[in-house]
Structure formats: C-alpha cells, structure tokens
Amino acid sequence: KRVVVTIHGIDWQREKWQSGLGSKFIHQGEKNAVKYADEVIVLSKGVQDYFKETYGRKTHFIPNGVNRPQTREANLITDKFGLKKDSYILFLGRLVPEKGIRYLVEAFKNVKTDKKLVIAGGSSDTDSFMKELKELAKGDDRILFTGFVQGQMLDELYSNAYIYTLPSDLE
C-alpha cells in the first residue's frame, strides 16, 4: 500500500508545544513522514520550501480549498463596529502567536493609512496572548478586535474587506 501524508504546517515549532516533550515527538513524526511516505502534500509554498531545504524532499503543493462566503453588504459590521466597504484590512483566525498577528499589529502601527485593521477571531489556548495583543495595539484606535465571529457577521467581514492578510510563521 502507498502512504500519502498531508502536512498542514511546521507543527513542532508552534509555541504551545515548546514546553515538555510535545515538540520533540511532533518533530520526529515529521521526520518519519519524510522518510516513509510515498508522497507528501503541503498546503503552502513556505512549507514546501522548508521540506525541500531541510530534507531535500519533493512535495506536492495543494492549498486548501475554501467555501466562498455569501457576498453581503456591510450592515451588521457597520452597526456594531462602524465598518464600511473597503475601509479595513482583515485578519481572521485563531489568535495564537504562530499566526504572526504580533508582526501585523507592529507593522500596521507604522503605516500611515486611514484604513482600520480588523482582527477577528478567538483565542485558542490561553487569554494571555490576547492581552499581549491588546496591549500592543493600545493607543491606535484604528485597530479593532471583534472576538469570535460567525454567520452573517463573518460573511460581511469577508465581503467588505479592502484586503485579507495572514502573516503566519508556520502555515
């Protein structure tokens, strides 16, 4: 039988695995995947480059598909957050260090723009990183944290964003 492995990211580098043995076990699993899998699928060019440079391993880049959100006018997001079409840059995802949100906030604070930075999503493991982000964003009223969103609110955020950004370290 043939073995095909799909790699979603460089998981052993995630901050949540750095204490204890988790990182070592996951890293060993990565090495086993490289050694024993007949084919390796990766979801990003960055991970593809990592496997080529680290292991000399050829991989197949197949990004995840997405369900296109229903296009919606800015109603709920205008009422709740004062957002209008093309008035903001959107980050949406779990608020964890490896998503690169810290870099995003730091960079955005140095950009002269009338756009807002909307950070949508909930914390995954602890609230300490969320507190750190809010402290980092303090004093810049262009940066907005919505918390977890879904349904019509999610569709409106996607539909009306000027641009979407995902500054991830590992994905």
Where do the PLM segments sit?
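Carbohydrate-associated surface elements
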Residues: G46, G65
